[in-house]
Amino acid sequence: MPGLKITLLQQPLVWMDGPANLRHFDRQLEGITGRDVIVLPEMFTSGFAMEAAASSLAQDDVVNWMTAKAQQCNALIAGSVALQTESGSVNRFLLVEPGGTVHFYDKRHLFRMADEHLHYKAGNARVIVEWRGWRILPLVCYDLRFPVWSRNLNDYDLALYVANWPAPRSLHWQALLTARAIENQAYVAGCNRVGSDGNGCHYRGDSRVINPQGEIIATADAHQATRIDAELSMAALREYREKFPAWQDADEFRLW
C-alpha cells in the first residue's frame, strides 16, 4: 500500500506582494525531492488581506508557477491564493500536479471577524482530490471550526488545512486539528504561516501532522520559518479503521 510523503512549509509572507512571495518560495522549494505533497500556507501570495484579490496575480500566472514547481519537485503543490474570478473574489485552495492537472476548492467558511465574508464569495462544493493512491480533502483555515464540513463519510484519508491562524488562538488551532483527526479517523495536516502581516496580526505557526489516533507525528517549532516532513501510512490507517470502526456508527446525515 502506498505511503504518502508530505512536506509543510511554515513561512512568513510578504504583505500584498505576489512576485516577492513567489521568489521566496522558489528558494524554499529548491532542492526538495522525494516528496509526494508539498504544502504552502493560506493566501501564500499576499497574506490574509481583504483587498488582495483585486490586485492579485492572475490565476494562470499562479498555476503556471505551481505547475513548474510541481514538475521540479515531482510532487503535488498545494496552497491557497486570493483570486478575482468572473463570479467574484475567492480564497481558492489550488492543488497542482506535475502533469499540469489543477484541482481547486473555494473556502467555504469565511472569517467574518475580519470581514472576509464581505470581500470574498464562499465556496459551496466539497472537493476530494485523489493523488498517488490517497484521497485528500482540502480545507482552509476557519473551515477547521466547523466539523460537519469535514465529516468523513469514508471518502477521504487525509484532511489538509492551510491557514493564516493568529497566535492568540493557537491553542484552538492545535486542539481542533487533533479533534478532526480523532473524530474522522483520518490523517490531518495543518500548514500555518509565521511572522506578522499588514494588519498587525501575529502568527506563530504550530504547523503539524497528526495521525488518526490523534498523535502528533511531526510539528514545527513556534515562530520559526521552517519545513517539516512526515510519511503517512495507508496500511496503518486501514488497520486502525478496521480494528476500531467507529465510523460505522456515525449519525446518518449530510449537508452536501
UniProtKB/Swiss-Prot annotation:
Reaction equations catalysed: a monoamide of a dicarboxylate + H2O = a dicarboxylate + NH4(+)
Active site: 42 (proton acceptor), 107 (proton donor), 141 (nucleophile)
Keywords attached to this entry: Hydrolase
Keyword Hydrolase in record: yes
A single MF term (Gene Ontology): omega-amidase activity
Domain CN hydrolase: from-to ranges: 4-234
Keyword NAD in record: no
Record CDD domains: Xc-1258_like (cd07575)
Top-rank EC class of the record's enzyme: hydrolase
Gene3D superfamilies listed in its UniProt record: Carbon-nitrogen hydrolase (3.60.110.10)
PROSITE patterns linked to this entry: CN_HYDROLASE (PS50263), UPF0012 (PS01227)
Stored InterPro entries: C-N_Hydrolase, C-N_Hydrolase_sf, Omega-amidase_YafV, UPF0012_CS
EC number: 3.5.1.3
Highest taxon in the source lineage: Bacteria
Family listed: Belongs to the carbon-nitrogen hydrolase superfamily. NIT1/NIT2 family.
Main function: Hydrolyzes alpha-ketoglutaramate (a-KGM) to alpha-ketoglutarate (alpha-KG) and ammonia, has weak activity on L-glutamine, almost no activity on deaminated glutathione (dGSH) and none on glutathione. May function as a metabolite repair enzyme.
Name of the protein in its database record: Omega-amidase YafV
Organism from which the protein derives: Escherichia coli (strain K12)
Gene name, Swiss-Prot/TrEMBL: yafV
